[in-house]
Amino acid sequence: AWMRAPYEPQEGQPADYRGYGTMTDEAVRDANRKARERKMQLLAHCNGDGACGQYLDCWEQAAEEERTEREKRAGGRTPGNDRPVMIHAQLLGLDQLARLKALGMIPSFFLAHVYHWGEDHVRNFGWERASRISPAGSALALGIPFTLHQDSPVIRPDMLETLWCAVNRLTRDGRILGKEERIPVWDALRAVTANGAWQYFEEEEKGTISPGKRADFALLSADPLKTPPENLRDIRVLATVKDGERIWGDGI
């Protein structure tokens, strides 16, 4: 992860080691420019707050270019209409959230990191920074819509484990990593349903079970809203339905 401040001391690395970027600023700006010209949504993989800052800088420049262009013509698209996505946003700084919101950018958090590698983050970045990884609670407080993902095949595609991670934020050692970043079950469910559809411009046909929308849903062994938070990952998927047809399971 490319960081703004150095890692905790790392064997074989200088004391000021911060990781490094994989793209130049110009390459990021060029990708942004091409995406906007072709009216394509842009999603960028950003782990450290250094990479997050580079992506935000790119979009802030795009926003300024759009404002200048709108002075020359009426109407037009804005960066917010493009719904750019920041994938992982693992070590996104809390001070960067306001910038992200102003741009209409969507963070998609790989929140299972808290359980699978939370203790590694503590060793690499110290407790304070590690406790802020995947800051879903702070994003929620600011009214920023976000989604959750598993990054399969890095880990298995288990959405219920991800819900459990978002609500409890327990590491493998059983420690709560970032109590203030935990979110309610309802908001975790929205992050993987309605917000997911909205992220990909599909909110008119997916994301909620509503009249006129596609009948895409999963049948679970228990109601997540009535299940003790510590037991969320024990809920089983009994069946999945797509366009009204059962495609997996025999629960219905």
Identify the residue ranges that each predicted region occupies.
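Active-site-adjacent helix-turn-beta-strand microarchitecture at beta-sheet edges
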Residues: 1-41, 69-72, 97
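Glycine- and charge-enriched low-complexity intrinsically disordered segments
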Residues: 249-252
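His/Asp/Glu-enriched, well-ordered alpha-helical/loop segment
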Residues: 33-43, 50-84, 89, 94-226, ...
